[in-house]
């Protein structure tokens, strides 16, 4: 399942993000989307987990204050 993360800094380290997200399950891929406002990229994290687990992960991450910003996480139901 894919989780959309917003709120990370523009210079977020994909390898560090992969490492941190791997605590929730196997990370298949991470795509950085920098179109639009380059200061506010968003990331699509593809985890090898079912929808229920992905929803739990998104709920745990959503609203965390990380490096001067609040993170937001949503499960991507299509795609």
Which sequence ranges carry the predicted segments?
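Canonical RRM/RBD RNA-binding surface and closely related RRM-like beta-sheet modules
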Residues: 1-74
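Glycine-rich beta-strand-turn "strand-cap" elements at beta-sheet edges
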Residues: 76-79
């Amino acid at each position: 399942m894919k989780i959309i993360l917003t709120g990370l800094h523009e210079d977020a380290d994909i390898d560090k993000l992969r490492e941190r997200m791997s605590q929730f399950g196997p990370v298949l891929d991470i795509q950085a989307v920098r179109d639009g406002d380059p200061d506010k990229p968003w990331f699509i994290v593809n985890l090898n987990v079912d929808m229920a687990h992905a929803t739990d992960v998104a709920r745990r991450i959503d609203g965390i204050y990380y490096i001067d910003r609040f993170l937001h996480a949503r499960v991507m139901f299509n795609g």
